[in-house]
């Protein structure tokens, strides 16, 4: 009988960051069944913010099949792009995001210039 935790992990590093057997999207990630050892690994990573939402005990993995709403939440998290405030990123993180998206920029660009380069890439949301 393992003790499991429901946690929310905030990833501000990059899309697809991996730790403790999980792949994280940018922003908040809700995890339904995290073991004690996985929780310790997540908490040990200074690049992640971990918040425990619930604790419980599981016998053999039955918890996931009993709660289909948790899997729906997980699908919704992955389907909706995370809402991030670009001003919270450092210049290096912005440069990494632009490089991943294939957007070219000057190495001497300021933070404001780098943020402005995201606008054409996120052109779907033109209405306020």
Swiss-Prot record:
Residues 53-87 are annotated as: Disordered. CDD domains: LEM_like. SUPFAM superfamilies: PriA/YqbF domain, Rho N-terminal domain-like. InterPro entries: FluMu_N (IPR041227), HeH/LEM_domain (IPR025856), Rho_N_sf (IPR036269), SAP_dom_sf (IPR036361). GO terms for molecular function: DNA binding. Pfam families: FluMu_N, HeH. Monomer. To phage Mu protein gp35. This is Mu-like prophage FluMu protein gp35. It comes from Haemophilus influenzae (strain ATCC 51907 / DSM 11121 / KW20 / Rd).
């Amino acid at each position: 009988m393992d003790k499991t935790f429901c946690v929310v992990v905030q990833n501000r590093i990059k899309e697809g960051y991996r730790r403790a057997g999980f792949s994280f999207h940018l922003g908040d990630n809700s995890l339904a069944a995290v073991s004690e050892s996985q929780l310790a690994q997540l908490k040990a990573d200074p690049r992640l913010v971990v918040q425990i939402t619930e604790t419980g005990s599981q016998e053999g993995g039955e918890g996931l099949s009993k709660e289909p709403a948790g899997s729906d939440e997980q699908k919704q998290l992955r389907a909706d792009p995370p809402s991030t405030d670009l001003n919270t990123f450092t210049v290096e993180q912005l440069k990494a995001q632009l490089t991943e998206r294939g957007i070219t920029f000057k190495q001497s660009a300021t933070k404001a210039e780098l943020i402005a380069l995201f606008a054409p890439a996120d052109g779907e949301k033109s209405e306020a």
